[in-house]
Amino acid sequence: MSDIESLNGGDLFAEPSDFYKPPPEPHFATYTRDDVPESSTSQQKDIKLRLVGSSPLWGHLLWNAGIYTAKHMDSHPEEVQDKLVLELGAAGALPTIIAGLLGARKVVSTDYPDADLISNIQYNVDHNIYGGEELFKDEEKRSKQMANRKVVVEGYIWGNDYEPILKHLPQDQQKFDLIILSDLVFNHTEHAKLFKTTKDLLRENGKALVVFSPHRPWLLENDLAFFKDCEEFGLKSDLIELTHWKPMFDEDEETVEIRSSIYAYYLSHI
C-alpha cells in the first residue's frame, strides 16, 4: 500500500470537500427614512445598501449607531445642508448617503483602505446617489468625474497624511463643518488617532457627531473614556442623548440594558 493512502484506500493528504469555503457573498439591507425633511435635495426614502459578506473591520453589518446617525441627520438637516462633511470608518456608508441626499456641499466618505470595503462603499454611493453610474476606469476621466461629484470615497487610515481627503475640498476651505464617527469608539487603541484627525480636520466652529453602542459591556468604561480623553487634544464633548434600542445580538440577558444603549455626542474645539 502506498505511504500516502489512507487505511480506507483514499489519499491521506487530500483536503476534505468542505476544507475551503469561499467567503460569504455580499448581502443587501434596506433603510427607509422616516421623515424626509422638505429641504432635502432628494426626497428618496428607501436606501438599499450592499454590505460585504464578512469583514474583520465589521463593515458587513448595518449597525444601530449608523441608523441612529441617519435619523439624527434627517432630523437636523441644517447641520448637513451646504456643509463640508467627512465620515470616518464609513462601512456601509448610510450616514454618507444621507448627507448626500440632504444636500451637503461635499461629502468625503472614508474607511480603511481594504479593496473590498472601499469598492463596496463606492457601489453604495454610485447606486444611491448617482443612479447606478459607476466611476470611469480611465484615470483622467475618473478624476474629472470625481471632481464633479459631491460625494466621493477614499481609503484612509486614521492619523495618516490628510492629502487623500483634503484634495477633494476647495483650496481656501481645508476643514470640515461636520465629521461623522459612527460606531468607532470601540477601537480603544485608535482613540488618539481619531482625536488628532478630528481636531486637525474640523473647522473652528464645526461639530463631530459621535454615536456608538457598547458591544462589549465589560469595556463600557473604556468606551466612555473617549469623551473625557478628548480634552487632551483640545476637544470637548457634549451629550446629545442616551437612548435604548433592541441590541444587535441576542446574548447574555444580564447585559442587555448596556448593549441596547445608544450614546450620541458632539465633539467641538475647546
Curated annotation (Swiss-Prot):
EC number: 2.1.1.-
Keyword check for Secreted: no
Binding site for S-adenosyl-L-methionine: 63, 89-91, 111, 158, 182
Domain of life, source organism: Eukaryota
An MF annotation (GO) of this entry: protein-lysine N-methyltransferase activity
Coiled coil: none
UniProt subcellular location: Cytoplasm
UniProt entry keywords in alphabetical sequence: Cytoplasm, Methyltransferase, S-adenosyl-L-methionine, Transferase
Any Gene Ontology biological process: methylation
Gene Ontology CC annotations of this record: cytoplasm
Record InterPro entries: EFM7, Methyltransf_16, SAM-dependent_MTases_sf
Enzyme class (EC, first level): transferase
The keyword Methyltransferase appears for this protein: yes
Transmembrane segments annotated in the record for this chain: none
Ranges for region Disordered: 1-45
Family, as annotated: Belongs to the class I-like SAM-binding methyltransferase superfamily. EFM7 family.
Function (record text): S-adenosyl-L-methionine-dependent protein methyltransferase that trimethylates the N-terminal glycine 'Gly-2' of elongation factor 1-alpha, before also catalyzing the mono- and dimethylation of 'Lys-3'.
Protein name in UniProt: Protein N-terminal and lysine N-methyltransferase EFM7
Gene: EFM7
